[in-house]
Amino acid sequence: MMKSPPGQITRACQPHQVISLFAFAFGVNVCMGFTTNRVRRSEEWDEGPISVLSDSPWISTSGSCKNRCFELQEAEPPGCRCDNLCKSYNSCCFDFDELCLKTARGWECTKDRCGETRNDDNACHCSEDCLSRGDCCTNYQVVCKGETHWVDDDCEEIKTPECPAGFVRPPLIIFSVDGFRASYMKKGNKVMPNIEKLRSCGTHSPYMRPVYPTKTFPNLYTLATGLYPESHGIVGNSMYDPVFDASFSLRGREKFNHRWWGGQPIWITAAKQGVKAGTFFWSVVIPHERRILTILQWLTLPDNERPYVYAFYSEQPDAAGHRYGPFNSEMMVNPLREIDKTVGQLMDGLKQLKLHRCVNVIFVGDHGMEDTTCERTEFLSNYLSNVEDIILLPGSLGRIRPRSSNNLKYDPKVIVANLTCRKPDQHFKPYLKHHLPKRLHYAYNRRIEDVHLLVDRKWHVARKAVDVYKKPTGKCFFHGDHGYDNKINSMQTVFIGYGPTFKYKTKVPPFENIELYNVMCDLLGLKPAPNNGTHGSLNHLLRANVYKPTVPDEVAKPLYPVALPSASDFDIGCTCDDKKNKLDELNKRFHVKGMEEKHLLYGRPAVLYRTKYNILHHHDFESGYSETFLMPLWTSYTISKQAEVSGVPEHLASCVRPDLRISPGNSQSCLAYRGDKQLSYGFLFPPQLSSSAEAKYDAFLITNIIPMYPAFKKVWNYFQRVLVKRYATERNGVNVISGPIFDYDYDGLHDTPEKIKQFVEGSAIPVPTHYYAIITSCLDFTQPADKCDGPLSVLSYILPHRPDNDESCNSLEDESKWVEDLLKMHTARVRDIEQLTSLDFFRKTSRSYTEILSLKTYLHTFESEI
């Protein structure tokens, strides 16, 4: 069975519960609007021609499209259809083309057409009655009545919706563009004056981050549902389901089958709550101008028929980007101008209907575009001897499965090992899917193959040379592609919000597209279905907050244990030289209250599940110690800019002290480490950053140690010894919170103790799958971290805890050569950490909760500016 989506809501959101939602109106059309007659993609080299639904149950001669063009309801078979997707479903009435796809006299009024006699064969009208009949060309008022184009008007602040009588809410139009790289916006007013006006007059972000893989199907459906691909099930433009034993592709028939599509898209959410939705997808045979005119006509329908949510979809500039590459300015300008012209037609049409101060418009892309070509292709035949035994979904990422499901010799671990660090100039990195960076959220679905290749930007991967698609002339068919890691700058896309509900002339920080579903629900007054977004994190886009998020309730209250008077009963197999270390005197420090205000700058993290844990105070750090996991759930400390890194004296090199506040039965034992040659231990608070010689001893308490593979200690020690100090120096002090993560079933959620026992049966110490670190400072580096009264800055990591460092091909070199790159690959959001730990951070701060949610959903990408 398909896995449930990750997130707080997901264990109750099984796909078998939601697939049936597609039986509602419009749901059957979920996939076809962007699949017909598309440019061939790199990951479809081996696929056949595009298909439409054959053996249609609809009979074309069973009716006519007269007065039915682009009707909002789909006719039931055997009756024929006249809706926007009847072409894709091979279900149109015989006269659909003649009556509904008229192009006579073009799409614009000219002076000589003003006041023309109505001719029903025209594509749009310039007659005196066209306004009353709702079928004017969009420039009618400009050409025939002397009005100005919308783009030529000054920006105006629309403080409240100005809608005609009968409108119960501002309608929402989602204008989605395929392959719109964020940097295209730099072309500005000369190329895209209408889009530039939307940007400058409304709300925009420098870019919006797509989900991984940065492909069309996964991202359009994420925009519609707020779910990651592993959650909604559309994990690629092409995919294989081992339970269905069926393949899904842009060119195959399976895309028509509802069983592939999980989650609840916005149009179903609207329909379930009594809000009518217009169509979201269009067959490509319908010209852009006709799509715009149809939306405008729907807006003039009677109150009881009018939809309140619409979508327009453009196949450009993606098609041009694939063919010519994103940097071919000469060839990319025209597609961008055409999109801008269509935006202008929409806005002029809204103004003509006096709806330009009523309607909310979202202009959004699905992903970016990278420069690539056939010549930059890695062939697996240069690495593996058995490429005939595997199926590779090739291109800007690679997914590998056995050609035969009965191949008992196929071992994903062997494939990964044979592809790991084989060449010094290798342009892809192989992963078992559960080892992929957690920020990708790309593992917990049966349609995601066990072996995954992350491909370098600008490169492709293929099985062998003959798999690379070229023209018969031998020339490369494409010069651009997408699908790469979603944090790289070329994959970022555009977001603009314009209308009475969006803020005026406002720039907001970048965000991920999983958040837009909640915003769309807020714009329409809907309650969102469960999703992976963080509702309220984008409240700063809107004039008024429709939804007010609340801080989650703390479930487990901590205990504050006191130290026992004697250490005689604390035999945990650990040693420390009592004479040199003066342990009895040091144990008295347990009675001293810690420095919570210094080390818990943003309040104590809350535990959101039932468990028993203790707050342990120390001079240099605070810990939330779990008696279940025998280690801290979190440790927090603040390091000033002036802090010094000191060495560990020889007599402390192997010192581990018992903690008299925690009974031996609830502590780890040094004996467990002596008996396991594959496992060592590290420290959550680094002894090297202790503020004094006396305070250093606190770091050697057994309640500060965590199980670590020796290989991983290289990563952790470099992070603590070098990077934390560097961050503190660069950022004028930092607060660090770190701790363990247990995600053995790789569902992106906190594992229960029962779940962990299934994977580490017989182990005395539960070994984390990852460790996290949250580094927070003031956004204004002139302010010290502990005296910050402005916005905060955060970077976070989820570091894989593995017995080797094979992910880094140069891991035999000095740590300064590779550890930082590894950390950058495993950057993450605070929200990702919260879901993996069931902890809640930043609970005590003067900032608004919306600001905190924005901080939690921020991803530090380490990429250059767009």
List where the protein language model places each region.
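N-terminal signal peptide
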Residues: F22-S64, T103-A104, E147
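Active-site-proximal N-terminal segment of extracellular/periplasmic enzymes that hydrolyze or transfer
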Residues: V151-T203
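Short, structured active-site-proximal loop/turn typified by the sulfatase FGly-forming signature C/S-X-P-X-R
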Residues: S183-H232
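His/Asp/Glu-rich, glycine-adjacent segments
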Residues: T222, G226-F327
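Active-site neighborhoods of enzymes that stabilize oxyanions during catalysis
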Residues: L392-T506, F511-V519
